[in-house]
Amino acid sequence: MLRIDNLKLPVGAKEDKLRAACAHALRVSEEALVSVKLLRRSIDAREGVKLVCSVAVEVKNESGVWKRCKNKNVQPYAPKKYTPPAPVSAPEVSPVVIGAGPAGLFCALLLARCGARPILLERGRAVEQRKRDVEHFWRTGELDLTSNVQFGEGGAGAFSDGKLNTGTKDLRHGYILEEFVRFGASEDILVDAKPHVGTDKLYVVLQNLRREIIDRGGEVRFSHKVVDIEQNSGSVTALRVSAPEGEYTLPAKHVVLAPGHSARDTFEMLQKRGVPMEPKPFAVGVRIEHRQRDMDLAQYKEAAGRYGLPPTSYKLSCHTEKGRGVFSFCVCPGGEVVAAASEEKRVVTNGMSEFARDGENINGGLLVSVTPEDFPSGDTLAGVQFQRELEDAAYRLGGGNYAAPAQRVEDFLKHRPSTGAGKVVPTYLPSVRWCDLHGCLPPFVCEALKEGLPMLGRKLRGFDAPDAVLTAVETRSSSPVRIVRDNLSFRSALRGLYPCGEGAGYAGGIMSAAADGLRVAEMILEELNHE
């Protein structure tokens, strides 16, 4: 089999055009092609809009064709797939997974499939009820501290748009994508360069994934929050769990800690118990909204709105004179800015898109890098304190009831309050309050954004448009701490504890978190095989 990369086609090209392009690249007739399989596709809008594909081809006289075609984009291809570990005997004490985000779910899934009968503990609710709780909050401003955009089945990623981007070639990623499809996602994610599931389809995927864990002998307990870890001689022995029926003790020898980046009370408990942690860099800022059609025009130019092109996205970054990174994050085409608070009287924003991505606006995080040197103290959890201070200030500036402070870009750059929307109507609910965001963002963040916006506008026309809307504050781009673990065994210094996923500081997004969950499950299964 041969792989052809960088195969360029007109947007909207049909399968016959793909076969013809493959034959041309290989310098053979179409009749010589035995099979053609699309591996990857993307849209390149830099010089005219083109579809760029990678394709696996079976062709007659393969070795002769490869030698003769002399095309640097053609190479021999032997597809590789992830091989799950062998099954194990069910242990006397079930492994426990804390947190039902991507890391916890895929860890529990692999453990269950291999016969380990895991117990998955999630502090929030099942996605069906969680969806109702979140939508009630957006309508009314009545926040449920146990079931919100941060806590519940699926983790924070359940209310994004299910972006499955990854920059690595780990074989686990193909396995994860195939599982998403098996559980209800579109097959397009297997080939799209920027795959996304869509928040609406994620609800279905999560329910099916949960059923698989249970059908394979696992157990899933919602509204069960781990409040303490019991230990003896440096090893985990049990967990104290708060549940609707009251507290109970759960014996445990293998505990996967995948709490998510917003489990601040869990971080505090771990600190009290002496579990090694360290502060880590992250980023804070705002969500920026534009009209989708304006960004489509900037990227696709005269092709905008034609050929069935998808709503465009973007990925932008720059550095200020002082070395601060300013960059886009979690861009949601055709989406909306959402209220993502998980603590009382604190405003947090995030972005979300459904599968169709057919909303009026596109939004993305516009973030500034921060390091532990920016935090208010040298404490391990000083990053949490820093986040809370920004969220408190945003709540006050928004005027209460989880209204978010908002400002037009032109007004932000001129340091004057906004009085209303221009061409771009903000999507955040329950509501926004027009003001000056300098009242809730640290001076160094404002300075970096004011320097960065024009630079990014030069990279993408209209990004710094006067009527683009900034909504504050975005603080939960990644975890403010790293729960220290061994690089080989994935264990904490507290034996039997396996920090995992984004909340533990070892991932950044759905794909990397899910892959980390698989890695930790593999290690536990190996240990169970030797017990």
Report the location of each language-model feature.
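Residues forming the flavin
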Residues: 1-531
